[in-house]
Amino acid sequence: MARIASVNIPDNKRLVVSLTYIYGLGPTMAAEICNKAKISKDKKVKELTDQELIGLRNIIESEYKVEGDLRREVTLNIKKKKDIRCYQGLRHIRKLPVRGQNTHSNARTRKGKAIAIAGKKKAVK
């Protein structure tokens, strides 16, 4: 397995598909990286030479934020919104959907498991 950006990418898949295993790289960015490195997108990772792998690593490290750096940036952005108490920050604090989704009947995943409301107890005669 080739190791790029501290991620083991699968050998038996096409290069474009393998690059998407790296957090922060989707299909479009993976294709863009292949074009910059002048490597065929259909080439399998196990067919790449050491020079091509080094070239891919250099392009990814120098031009893109991936893995730990990207995760840290996203976390800091969310923390900043929470600190300034903007609307999105308040939604994060309350663990509700942030981008305007309905919550009356949906958003179970974000809100957590449904809590049963205790029924009224019958009066004893």
Curated annotation (Swiss-Prot):
Entry keyword annotation includes RNA-binding: yes
GO BP terms in the entry: translation
TM spans (from-to): none
Superkingdom of the organism of origin: Bacteria
Keywords: Ribonucleoprotein, Ribosomal protein, RNA-binding, rRNA-binding, tRNA-binding
GO molecular function, one term: structural constituent of ribosome
Cited HAMAP family: Ribosomal_uS13
Similarity comment: family membership: Belongs to the universal ribosomal protein uS13 family.
Descriptive protein name: Small ribosomal subunit protein uS13
Classification lineage: Bacteria, Pseudomonadati, Pseudomonadota, Alphaproteobacteria, Rickettsiales
